[in-house]
Amino acid sequence: MIRANLLAAAAGAILVATPAAGQLARADRTKLEQAVKSPARTPANVARDRYRHPAATLAFFGVRPSHTVVEIFPGGGWYSEISAPYVLGGGGTYYAAAPDRALSGFRRLQGVNPQLYGKARTASFPARAAGEQGVPDGRADVVLTFRNVHNWLMGEQPYAELAFRQMFAMLKPGGVLGIEEHRLPESAAAAREMSSGYVKVSTVRRLAQQAGFRFVGSSEINANPRDTKDYPEGVWTLPPTLTLGDKDKAKYSAIGESDRMTLKFVKPR
């Protein structure tokens, strides 16, 4: 009950700035809390809740158990362990969307626990080649992407604009795009977005709005003022990666996971 009240209070604080955000019915908030507290979650993932604030983040995005939800690049399934059972258990539909080779982590979840994840669907994202099965256009109520935009900007063939166009296409009119991403100061050199793992809020907003999205609001639930964003190996210097190994491990562990933007967009009706 205490955690549920804290979640409601957090959502209320967010709503001061963004009235359309976080308005989950009491029953949905309860189901979300149950998904977060599920004993089926990996203990190492549970330990990171203090950095990632999954209940408050999903409430801010307004994810309901009856929704059709697409998670872009779910990776090893950190959020999938919460959002997939929450949605599938409430009569909704859950898609894990990524290139086929990047869906191995999610498929492992399905193999280990088919009761929880067996009804989930997979789709190719971004769908580029003929015959690739992406999420059908106009299907999703909510599209979620956590810590992925920086990858779409980096490398020899960046595809951020394509990714945002396809996310826009898969949403229903009125559908929500929720983004969590490592946050680069607006005063930083733009070139750092290509190597540090951090991205400017203005860059994410530009990409979304170019694709047709309308910005709804932001939350500071995933902010971390201890993150100075000036590390030798970029954001991967911090937990959970700690790419420098034991070198200054205590220092970087004390900082915690990165400072992150949490942004909500809507596909206009």
Predicted feature residues:
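Class I SAM-dependent methyltransferase Rossmann-like catalytic core
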Residues: L32-F60, R64-P65
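Conserved class I S-adenosyl-L-methionine
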Residues: R64-G75
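A conserved beta-strand element that flanks and buttresses the S-adenosyl-L-methionine
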Residues: L144-N148
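Conserved Class I S-adenosyl-L-methionine
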Residues: A190-S218
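A short acidic, Gly/Pro-enriched loop at the edge of an enzyme's catalytic core
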Residues: E132-V143
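C-terminal lobe and adjacent flexible extensions of AdoMet/dcAdoMet transferase-like proteins
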Residues: D248-R269
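A short glycine-rich, Lys/Arg-flanked "PGG" loop and its adjoining helix->strand segment in the class I
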Residues: L88, Y159-P173
